[in-house]
Swiss-Prot record:
Localization (cell): Cytoplasm
Catalytic residues identified in the record: 300 (proton acceptor)
Catalytic activities: cytidine(2498) in 23S rRNA + S-adenosyl-L-methionine = 2'-O-methylcytidine(2498) in 23S rRNA + S-adenosyl-L-homocysteine + H(+)
UniProtKB keywords: Cytoplasm, Methyltransferase, rRNA processing, S-adenosyl-L-methionine, Transferase
Job of this protein: Catalyzes the 2'-O-methylation at nucleotide C2498 in 23S rRNA.
Principal subcellular localization: cytoplasm
Subunit text: Monomer.
Enzyme Commission identifier(s): 2.1.1.186
Name of this protein: Ribosomal RNA large subunit methyltransferase M
Family classification: Belongs to the class I-like SAM-binding methyltransferase superfamily. RNA methyltransferase RlmE family. RlmM subfamily.
The protein's enzyme class: transferase
Amino acid sequence: MNTLFMHCRPGFEGEVCAEISEHAARLGVAGYAKGKPQSASAEFVCSEEGGAERLMGELRFNQLIFPRQWARGGYVELPESDRISVLLAQLVDFPVFGSLWLEVLDSNEGKELSTFCRKFEVPLRKALEKAGRLVDDPGRPRLLLTFISGRRVFVGVASASNSALWPMGIPRLKFPREAPSRSTLKLEEAWHQFIPREQWEQRLGDDMTGVDLGASPGGWTYQLVRRGMLVTAIDNGPMAESLMDTGLVQHLMADGFTWQPKHPVDWMVCDIVEKPARTTSLIETWLGEGLCREAVVNLKLPMKQRYAEVRRLLDRMEATFKARKIRVSIACKQLYHDREEVTCHLRRLDLKPR
């Protein structure tokens, strides 16, 4: 129970290690991080009893940037035949669970195990329920079984309210055929990640206005239009005719980094390929000057020192807003649909309600 296991995007194991090591050092939890390149996972092995539990207790999962999912526990080797009996024996000292997720890594090997997990879950669930180890209670801890192979599994536990929203941190979003580009899924995932579902009507309402900077061909604009917003699309490139035909989109041929609205809007979204420091300046202007209430912006990552650069820019934003004496909530996550980038959500907390 003294290892913290984390899923991530393949190639970002080093960023997960850097991030969790920084938090562990700040909290005084001794241990070391390790992650095999392209394995889609990393671990923090605690050298003191209860270290992993303390890390998960002190940290909020939604404040971590690069981990997609986490659980504390340990590895179990399984026989070829009676895997369930071995797992039940291993779970004797665990609490009673309120939910069960079988997970695999986001790798070719992991995908090959998906069919096995689907078939294995039904008899395992029945056995856990019969043994009194699993009940239907969202308030209880979640049992997370990450299969590395058919013979090796990481048996982990996490709070259902302090872990990923979806198994492996991967949302099951369907690409809308009428959307102009697949980038639309990034913004849809961001809504789920950063805004509680019960607040969507209030914060993503059809009486709102939005701006999409660098909008062409309209993947992110599509999400705003889908919510019924009036959208100003800023880009020198063309917009999809299907979006223009809705009557909800005004397309202005302008530079997304210099154009500003005459009146404040509810939402600004931006997915421009640019150096992250320049995009950060754009965020500071829009939120700092009250040009929008909320924003979702992608920061493109450098080739090296990716976590360090993201941390530096987030700290810079926080210091800038503090110096201006304005209250802004800042969240950042590498979403499943992100590639060499992270997605930031910002919200002014000191503006009068609409």
